[in-house]
């Protein structure tokens, strides 16, 4: 059992090393959000094409960092442990900035 967990952790670490910059930003945004994050808000913040957004979502979903939320147009951390691990790895000042950016983008997108 202990060896299995080590192997799983090593594999997970290798996966995270290959994560694209957009994938990292997306997983950070979803983990920083205090509520399920809408697709439109994520795309606005990432400033990427529809195609790149789709590819980035596929990447983070496949790595079990993010999953669809209760509404099919929202996204949340894959599970509580994943969300906690990502959000605690973010500098507190950056976390505050990300949350402010999310709030501002949500207002602009849905005006």
What would you call each of these model-derived segments?
Residues 1-111:
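Short secondary-structure boundary elements
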């Amino acid at each position: 059992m202990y060896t299995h967990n080590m192997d799983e952790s090593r594999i997970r670490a290798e996966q995270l090393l290959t994560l694209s910059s957009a994938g990292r930003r997306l997983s950070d945004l979803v983990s920083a959000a205090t509520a399920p994050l809408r697709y439109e808000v994520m795309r606005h913040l990432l400033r990427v094409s529809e195609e790149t957004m789709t590819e980035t979502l596929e990447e983070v979903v496949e790595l079990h960092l993010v999953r669809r939320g209760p509404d099919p147009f929202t996204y949340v951390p894959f599970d509580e442990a994943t969300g906690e691990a990502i959000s605690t790895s973010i500098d507190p000042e950056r976390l505050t900035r990300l949350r402010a950016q999310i709030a501002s983008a949500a207002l602009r997108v849905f005006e």
